[in-house]
Amino acid sequence: MSFLCVRTVSRFRSLSRALAPGFLLLHGNAVPKTAVFFRQQSSNTRLFSSYTAPSGVEENNSKSALKNKLPPGKEVSSKDAKEKITTSAIDLALNSVVKVFTVSSKPRLFQPWQITMQSESTGSGFVISGKKILTNAHVVANQTSVKVRKHGSTTKYKAKVQAVGHECDLAILEIDNDKFWEGMNPLELGDIPSMQDTVYVVGYPKGGDTISVSKGVVSRVGPIKYSHSGTELLAIQIDAAINNGNSGGPVIMGNKVAGVAFESLCYSDSIGYIIPTPVIRHFLNAIEESGEDVSFGSINLTYQKMDNDQLRKDFKMSDKMTGILINKINPLSDVHKVLKKDDIILAIDGVPIGNDSSVHFRKKERITFKHLVSMKKPCETALLKVLREGKEYEFNSSLKSVPPLVPKRQYDKSASYYIFGGLVFLPLTKPYIDSSCVSESALGKMPKKAGEQVVIISQILEDDINTGYSIFEDFQVKKVNGVQVHNLKHLYKLVEECCTETVRMDLEKDKVITLDYKSAKKVTSKILKSLKIPSAVSEDLQPKQQNKRSKVPPKSKEH
């Protein structure tokens, strides 16, 4: 069995020890505490790198110590030529990199009407043009407070999260204080480094409170699944130590930023990952163009490779043709309008796709074609060259991402829930699957309608009215009074607007629950009161209250 350890190794300091949620494994008696969670699934094992703690790898708080790490005149290769790392470049980094202090809290997974204890964590960030600070989304996810401290200062400045891109694990902070910006210099984005290029990771990792720098070499460039979002995007692997707390800090090559530090490989020494500049620019451009809507392109289909000779022959591919075979297409996607099952995608925007699903990247490097797809904006189209029953066709189609049936991750939002007769209904999410006995089969399914959700009975708050129903925890609700359930809001509406004495719910595996409507409503009120639950329904499901204030008509002019 392969293992995936997703560790949020942010250092969490409990602000209320007695309220520690069950999913936190608290080690030792002294605060601060470290929150760690594990799950089994895949061989891709990585960890986040936000932290707050003393460490043995800190650098001296002086510029001279950093200069020892980054000697002037040190030669490193760039994309086209070699550049010299000068003292001015080091000084620029010192006057740009900041430490980010975050207090966060999120809804409990199984009691969504409650929030977890507040926790403190830290990460890094750096100044970019426009008086903005770039950091990781996971550094400020579910934040209730964000503060920033610059190098050489003891003052923490209040920061505002201006924009977040959870897909790409990036965020922008703003600080409305002129004193903070005194002496601060923005860093400039560079190009993707080449293999064996030397880079320097600057930030505030574990082990101390001062700025630190570590040196590494680029060992690999290619898409990976970002741990924060589960989205597959381009990343750069380096052998520099990206420790807890480095998240959000710049990785410098020459006098420019090569990427943002954000992950490292569990149980491996000096294998770190950085977000490259094409992903950063895509994020920044999206913020500039649409405010807060940050999304990356998606192929919205499943496919298989065409390595087998007989398979290529049966699908009428010539010896010169290469591509991938379409297995299933998301019915809500734009490509569903032009592509068909068993089509062979030969090329995207004129770039041939190999039988192994790779495309040419640079020199002799190849990466998955998904990188070309991910860099598409929602408003852009791609030219798809397709082989269908032996004939070649070309189609223009948008590659706008379609929300999955089961969300991978959810941040910065209140949880949805509905309680009726002691039954707690929730929309199924991947974190819920990872923390329960629910089958992962729903993860591979595609939505048939926009807004569709898998609604489950998360738990049953015991009462005489639901006796015998506890065995149906984690079961999906298929129908309410014979009507197919579209999502949680639809279920809420079907139950609340019930006109019959009995509410019937058809579950998966052909199981059935029935409740007397009036009795269930009374029991719900009793349960809410006894368990101190503020409401039977989350705010997002409640109908918006219309403004009942009567408008005062304008006074008529006297003639």
From Swiss-Prot:
Region (Serine protease): 100-292
UniProt keyword Magnesium present: no
Molecular-function GO term, any one: serine-type endopeptidase activity
Compartments reported by the entry: Mitochondrion matrix
InterPro entries noted in UniProt: DEGP_PDZ (IPR041517), DEGP_PDZ_sf (IPR046449), PDZ_sf (IPR036034), Peptidase_S1_PA (IPR009003), Peptidase_S1_PA_chymotrypsin (IPR043504), Peptidase_S1C (IPR001940)
EC number, as in UniProt: 3.4.21.-
GO CC list: mitochondrial matrix
Entry keywords, A to Z: Hydrolase, Mitochondrion, Protease, Serine protease, Transit peptide
Biased composition (Basic residues): 546-559
Regions crossing the membrane: none
Span of domain PDZ: 300-380
Transit peptide (first-last residue): 1-48
Biological process per Gene Ontology, one example term: proteolysis
Gene3D superfamilies: 2.30.42.10, 3.20.190.20, Trypsin-like serine proteases
Region (Disordered): 59-81, 538-559
A Pfam short name: Trypsin_2
Active site positions, chain numbering: H138, D169, S247
Family the entry assigns: Belongs to the peptidase S1C family.
Record's function text: Putative serine protease.
Protein name: Putative protease Do-like 3, mitochondrial
Organism: Arabidopsis thaliana
